[in-house]
A protein has these predicted regions:
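Alpha-helical segment proximal to the catalytic Tyr-Lys
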Residues: 134, 178-182, 241
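Substrate-binding pocket helix/loop in short-chain dehydrogenase/reductase
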Residues: 105-106, 110-118, 144, 209, ...
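Residue(s) in the substrate-gating loop at a strand-loop-helix junction
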Residues: 149
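C-terminal substrate-recognition "lid" of short-chain dehydrogenase/reductases
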Residues: 126, 141, 221-250, 255-256
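Active-site helix of classical SDR
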Residues: 129, 165, 173
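Conserved glycine-rich cofactor-binding loop
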Residues: 15, 22-23
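Short, small/polar-rich loop/turn modules that mediate ligand/substrate recognition or access, typified
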Residues: 95, 181, 186, 243-245
Length: 257
């Protein structure tokens, strides 16, 4: 039984690239995949936090490498793919976890702000996939995980660009699946509920909002960082080989009731 489970979920010999991997859900996904046996490469804008996170992963016995990239600049997204392949040789698992929500009132959103948020959340995953899927195809195996959101399905105030991008992520996930799954590459999205990350600090800094959102779940609590570990490993492993094009809401039932 243990060998059977090990074979289903073992990621040894795989290399995973996690964008937005220096903090939040990206860091915890990198931790989970690394502990499952994958070599991990993490990418983010700020070198200091990126190096700190890499050190934490290495201290856990994980083989980790860091790459600085600002994915609001799509040329940097393309360059990141080239640098990772040049240094590590291959990418088997791509996790598009970089995110930004500037939380501006609708009437104050500039074209630059709109474009920055769509580039990070929607365009970068598209072009990272475009760059990395062909070398997955050559091995007839690959996993692509996008990060959706509650805002993929419902609107929140002062977050129109973020919500528009996250809605697009759901359809992009289907489009990637349609294009690449016949080559052994699956693409799925994780839709987190409220987790204590930098993006949700305005909620978690307000006890009333924390309580309100917890009460909107079927489980009765908000997400804990460890809650993403199992799903991330599952979608990265052979266990999920017949699942593609899906968005799985990791929200404690927030969108179910």
């Amino acid at each position: 039984m243990s060998q059977f489970i090990h074979q289903l979920f073992d990621l040894q010999g795989k290399t995973a690239l996690i964008t937005g991997g220096s903090s939040g859900l990206g860091e915890d996904i990198a931790l989970a995949l690394g502990l499952a046996g994958a070599e991990v490469a993490i990418a983010a804008r700020r070198e200091g936090p990126l190096l700190d996170t890499a050190a934490r992963l290495i201290a856990q016995g994980i083989k980790a490498t860091s790459f600085v990239a600002n994915l609001s600049d799509l040329e940097q997204a393309k360059d990141l793919s080239k640098r990772v392949l040049s240094q590590l040789g291959q990418v088997d698992i791509l996790v598009n976890a970089a995110g930004i929500n500037l939380r501006e009132p609708y009437g104050e959103v500039s074209p630059q702000s709109w474009q920055e948020q769509l580039n990070v959340q929607l365009a970068a995953p598209f072009f990272m996939t475009q760059a990395l899927a062909p070398q997955m195809q050559a091995r007839k195996w690959g996993r692509i995980i996008n990060i959706a959101s509650l805002q993929s399905y419902r609107a929140f105030a002062n977050s129109a660009p973020y919500g528009a991008a996250k809605g697009g992520v759901v359809q992009l996930t289907r489009a990637i699946a349609q294009e690449w799954s016949k080559f052994g590459i699956t693409c799925n999205a994780i839709g987190p509920g409220f987790f204590p990350t930098a993006l949700t600090a305005p909620v978690f800094n307000n006890p009333d909002l924390v309580k309100m959102h917890a009460e909107k779940t079927a489980i009765g609590r908000n997400g804990e960082m460890k809650d993403i570990h199992g799903l991330a490993i599952f979608l990265s492993s052979d266990a999920s080989a017949y699942i593609t094009g899906q968005t799985i809401m990791l929200d404690g039932g927030y969108t179910a009731i």
